[in-house]
Each structure stands twice: as structure tokens, then as C-alpha cells.
Amino acid sequence: MSIIGTIYEDVTTDVLGHIGSWQWLVTFISATLMVPSMLNQYEDMFLLEPPREIECDVSASSSVFNTSLCTYSVLNGTKVYKCTTWHVKFLWMIWFKKSWLIFCDHKIKLLSTTIICRLGLVFGCIIFGLIADSFGRKLAISIDVVAELGFRLILTFCDSESWFLLLIFLRSLFASANIYMGIILTCEIASSSWRTLLNAVVSIPRMLSAVCLVPLANVAPNSETFNFIACIFSASLLILLRWTPESPQWLLYNRGIPKAEKTILRAAKINGIELCSDFKIRPVNHRAYQCLDENWSCVSILTTHNVRILTLTVLVFWIFYFFLWSSLYIRVHNEQQYYGLLKTFCFMVILGFINWSLSKNLKIKMLLTMNLAVIGAASTALVFINLLKFNIPVTNIISPFALAASIIVHALILNITPRLFAINIRATLFGCCYSCGHLGSMICYLIVIFRTVDKVILVIVEAGLAVLLIVLCCVLPDVDGRELPDVMEDMDYFSEYVNKASSMGVSKDQLSVT
């Protein structure tokens, strides 16, 4: 028997079991749908290397002495001219002409493109959160896949600066759902005992994108080729939409009980569970719908003290974390480039195994605190090394190690955050978290690129942020072994669970699975 409106019972788990083929299928589909986030090179475009297999078109000039990507010289190098047209080698075999190249524009254009891309993600994450909470997770995912395919294809052959910047913004706006929607879907189909592991699996593309995004984009000869390859991959994702289910949990709380029954029936067949032909989720009386009529406005979030504190704490946590991560990433990339990122990847694997081993005895919040302490200790060590002017090789290890720890922190907060929010505001608030995170990254980029603070001061700020994040961890509740909060009152983790079954005035006999 399962009851809508309580924090400790789940219809999906009751019918399908704690784990099965269907849960694994949804997890791997969700992880695959998040792969395009690894291919959005515009998020950190100012870190990309100049493209290859692009040649300046000098056919209209005579006596050309030397050429580069952006200029050519004539008359034994005495006169230098800027290139106005280029020949691009597309897919390593087809040449076509372009009249504008962003890498030959002012360097600030690369940073402005990054800011425009991030700004689109700020708005897009919130908008898709509202769409997912209002119309379903699958609709948001479907819009993202189609938009990703269309905008990637147009960007491949875009030859205008104004259109290019507009398309970057629109692509970020309309293709930002799958950054986090797969995590929400996995959360809502997983049982409490398997949710942490399945969330970790589906978060792998986001973890890899933190390290591999820029190197992966630099492997391609030019952005046109990279965009088209990403476009082909996005087209293949259309097939997965056929197997992507709507969240049964979301359907139950949005008066979609018949659709939830069909989804669970199909899932039961995949799991090899036989259900009777008249399987129904039957409300015994209309009081069971009281929880469905709850007011989900932002005012409700702000009027409950503990819910307000929890929400604001999580939003601030994401801003500070993304600022910290962006600062570490830029330093490692600028000082050590590929070798630094290779070290980071190795440290990330090592720390991942260590955290996985410790997770059997420690809670996620404790692991989060430990990794933040590692970042703080590493940043503090760098401060002393810089102040004392030690020139030792260990400095080339500390920064990648701190960056690897920050990526593990990212995986942990991806595991924790969606499990804090009620069903009908989960996607919106999770999207707001990502939006706040991108704002933190943009602030960091502006500070670092324009060098508004000294390098040592920036490292001190990193250490301070790590300590502040540890303090914020104390406010976050434990999510291990808990069911997801169904309604907003369930988000008040700080109150005692005296009336679990009657928290929404719903008794155990009001909604049953038969």
C-alpha cells in the first residue's frame, strides 16, 4: 500500500521493486542524454586554442610573402593586412569559404561569447525547470534534444557575427534542460536504497565535461567540424526519446494517474514482473487529492522558515562552488594546460574510488565536507608556497588535486540537491541552482580575465570559499536512505517527524495500489 503525500512510501518502488532492468535502462538513457553537455565548447570558449585546417584566402592579392590564420604580408613582409575571408576544411575533406572568424576578432569577443552562452544557460535552466514541473520531464528533455540538433546544424554554417552570437544565446536557452533533467528523472524512478548509486552513474557526463570539454573541443580541427559531429550525435538521441519515460512520481502528483499506471505497467514487463490486467492506483476518497491541490507558488517557499533557509542555503552553495571551481580550472588550464588536466583526470579517478569506498560507512554530506576540506587545505598550501616563494614541483600537483576534489564535490551536490525539493518545484529549484552556479562562473571569469585581484589574493579567496562551503554543509540535511519529499511540507527536514503519515492530512487508506 502506498500513500500520496507522505515522505516514506513510493508507488514505483512498491510495484517494480528496488532495482531492475527498467531502472537501469532509464539511468543509462538519462546519462546518454546528458552527453551533449560535454560538447558545449562555447561555455569556456575563451580557453580554446585557435582552430586548425583554416587558411586565409589570399587569392585576390599578389606577391604574398607570408600568411597566418588572421593576417598575411606582401612585398617581403613590409605590409601586413588582415584576412577578410577564409577557407575552412570541413570534416577533414570539404573546403568552404567564410567571411568572418571569431578567433581573428578582438580577444574580448571570445570572453563575451562565453558570457552570452552562460547567460543563456542562466535563463534556460530556470525556464526548463518551470516547463518540467508544469508539463512533465519528458517534454523538457524532448525540446532540448530537438533544439540541440537544430541550433548545432545552423551554427556549423553560420557566417555572421551578429547571427552567431544570437544563435549561441538561443542554443544555450533552448538546450539547457538535459544538463540536469536526467538527474531528476533518475531520482524519481530510483528507490531509496539505489538512488545514490544511480545518481552517481547519471552524473558521470557532467563530471567528465568539467575536465574534458576544452581538450575535446581542441581535438577537432575547427568548430565547424566539431559542431557537425555534435549535431550527428544529437540526431542519434532522437531514437532514445522513444524509450524515455515520463516520471511516474510526477504524473501521480499532477493528476496523471492513468498515465502513471501505463508507465508502471510497461516498466513491470521490462522488469519481468507480472501484474494483474486490472492494475489500478485507486483513490479511496477525494481527500487523497488534497495534496495535489497544494499551492506551489514561490510565496509558499518563502513563507515557511525552514524551507526558506534550506532553499537559500543551497542557492548560495551553488554560487560559491561554481566560483571556486572556475577559478581552480582556469589556473590549472593556464599554468599546466593538458598535463594539468591529465593529472586532474587521474586524481579524479583516484578520489572517486576513495569516496566510493568511504560511502559504505559515511554519509554523502560527510564526504562532501571532506572533499571541501581537501580543497581548502590545497588552496592554503598554495598561499604559503606563493608567499614564501618556494619553487618546488609539488605546486604542479596541488592545483590539479584541488580541481579533482572540486569535481567530486560537483558529483556529490548533484546527488544531494534534487533530493531536497518537493516534486512540483524540484526541477524549477534545481534549475535555479544551476543558474546561480553559472552566475558564479561568470563573476569568476570577469575577475580572472581582467585581473582585478592579485593571484595570491585569489587563492586566499578560494581557501575562504572552501571554509564557507563547509559551514553551509552543516545546514544541509542528510539525504541517505530517505524518500524524496513529495510535497512542500516534506521539505521541512528540520522539524521532528511526529506525524509522518498525516503531514498532509492523508491517511494510509486513502490511496492504494491494487
List each language-model region with its residue ranges.
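Flexible cytoplasmic loops linking transmembrane helices in multi-pass membrane transporters
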Residues: S2-W24, C70-I108, K269-Y338, Y497-T514
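Glycine-rich segments within core transmembrane alpha-helices of 12-TM secondary carriers
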Residues: L33, S37, G120-L121, A175-Y180, ...
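C-terminal transmembrane bundle
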Residues: M38, S172, I330-H333, Q337-A501
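Central mid-sequence intracellular linker of multi-pass
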Residues: P50-V80, P221-A288, A463-S502
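Hydrophobic alpha-helical transmembrane and interfacial-helix anchor sites in secondary transporters
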Residues: P51, I131, L216, L358, ...
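Central cavity-lining transmembrane alpha-helices of secondary-active solute carriers
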Residues: S112-L130, G182, L342-S357
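Conserved MFS/SLC helix-loop-helix module at the cytosolic interface between two early adjacent transmembrane helices
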Residues: F123-I154
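Helix-breaking motifs and short loop linkers at transmembrane-helix boundaries and internal kinks
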Residues: G136, F157-S162, A220-P221, I385-K389
